[in-house]
Amino acid sequence: EDRFSNIYDGFKAYPVTCTNDCYPASADIECESDMQNCQFVGNNPTVNSHTGFNVTWLGHASFLLNTASGEQILIDPVFGQFDWPVNWAFRLAEGFSRNEPAEVGEDKLAQTDAVVYSHIHYDHFNKADIAELGTKPEYLVPLGFAEHFPNRGYTIKEMAWYTSKSVGKTSIHFVPAHHFSNRIWVPYLYEDDNATLWGGWVFESEGKTLFFAGDTGYSPHF
């Protein structure tokens, strides 16, 4: 079976856990306990407010994007706890629960023109949220992604790297990232390593450009 791969393989080593090898200690981050309920306490840099985009952070890697030309786009929306079986495994192991972000109101969600996903990992794609988002927005997803949606009238556009789609007056381009994908692993029976593509997104509107890298390591693709 064909699987996807990074454009530039190179050396990559991903941490096994985030207990002690994920992030170095920093005076800018305070946690109640090891990696629990962490808050950024450092100085925020000055942000150029004339970017042409209005970006609202919804927690972790989820963003609500309003473009200069008036389109509303959700990026990697994950509103609640992670999908089964990850949420179940956390409870079974007495692990942590996700700090759920502030909810986006129904009226605001109803204005969404498109939803884009960078890859299929549980912290970026939550099946439980699809029913809430509904069939009104168009879904732009990496190759191999559509089969994870319910068969209920969703408008889904699977995209390869360096392909583009217009949503209203906003041009959206799918670009490479240096990462991997998987969602299901049953020892000796089934695995879906790199069965779906991954990447980042470039948004162009009214002469302005915004880049969402997705999950990525450094490589010449930048």
Residue ranges and their predicted role:
Residues R152-M159, S171:
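Active-site regions of enzymes building and remodeling cell-envelope glycoconjugates
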Residues G59-H60, V141-H148, A160-Y162:
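Short, polar loop motifs at secondary-structure junctions
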Residues L65, W161-K169, F203:
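Short acidic-hydrophobic surface loop/beta-edge motif
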Residues T51-G52, A61, T135, W161, ...:
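Residue-level marker for the onset of beta-strands and adjacent loop->beta junctions
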Residues F82, I120-F125, A146-F149, T163-S166, ...:
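Active-site environment of divalent metal-dependent phosphoester hydrolases
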